[in-house]
Amino acid sequence: MTRIAAIPTTPYANSERVLPGYQFADAFKVPAPRGITAMEAMRLAFAHRPLWIRTLMALRNQLGRLVGLTPAPAGGFPVVRESPDEVVLGFDDKHLDFRVVVALAGGFATLTTIVRWHNAWGSAYLAAIMPFHRAIAARMLEGVA
């Protein structure tokens, strides 16, 4: 089976509406199967996380507890809102707020991450996880293709 690689793309056009005052956004896209909904795409993206992603998320949760961060929910991030073409996930924490948007348009599924930090700790946290974030976001989206 040929693996479809997620490619970087322009972040979601309505990022400001999703998370007003955001300071960071990035996005990846893959071809979307015909007839798929955004919720189905989101489930595919989050369903088959390889061991290395599960390990990194578990490590993040363990280290995060030491500094008072909210652990990532075992069942996935809460859905903020959904439509057939868009699902917004995420939550607010003391160091930063984030949203993940899975959107369908033009035959592609796009995963955009949007972040607004509250303090220096939030900015530093984002900088520290950035290399892992990019690899994880791209790999998860590849599960849709």
Language model features by range: what are they?
Residues 69-106:
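Hydrophobic-ligand binding "helix-grip"
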Residues 35, 94-96, 115-116:
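Short, solvent-exposed loop/turn segments at secondary-structure junctions
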Residues 1-66:
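Hydrophobic ligand-binding cavity/cleft-lining segments
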Residues 103-120:
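Short acidic, glycine/tyrosine-flanked loop/strand segments centered on an H-E-D-like triad
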Residues 2, 121-127, 142-145:
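Terminal "cap-and-tail" regions of soluble proteins that handle hydrophobic small molecules
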